[in-house]
Amino acid sequence: AVRGISNPAFLILMSNAEQFETHVAELEELYPGVPSIGCIGMSYQTSVTEKGVSVTAFEGVEAVTDVLEQASIMPVKYISRVEKALQKINASSENTVCIDFCTGNDAAVLTTMYSILEKKKISLTGGTGDGGKVSVNGTVYTDADVFAFVKNNGGKVRVYKENIYYPNPQYRFIASKTDRSKYTVGELNGKPARQAYQD
């Protein structure tokens, strides 16, 4: 996964649940002191990697990484880490983005992040990983959001989003047996959700 990576300025790790902690430690050993974030999840390049590992390396950038702990109850307690990281990198909306990986409760995390990012008009991209674990700079966390401010030293950078879904009036679903804390839907229109999607 790291073949050809020689002098990275920032690294993103995507691994599987069984090997995540091992891959985090190996990445830190191979590239000590290089800012990194990681999570459990799939990755895509020319094919989909579900049970393996992928590493994305950045050059020509500066990166500052940190963590918001206690994501499930009070990520705002660690908001000063976001502020300090922004100051350290001297972020600008023209050349800096924020990338984050969360273990869950992303609604509270996003509210916390946006309370700072909106002031500077810094874009955010990222997601919630699987398995309840994320990493930053070689340390694995549970119940946390790891983030990186990535500043392009040679130009601009932007985050774009596209909604690939569109309204379809012939379908209406009533969700039940939901768990808001885990963002799960048990049933749609009285059928198991998995079955409803397959139909």
Where are these regions (language model features)?
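Small-residue-enriched flexible segments
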Residues: A1-F20, E26-L30, V34, C39-D199
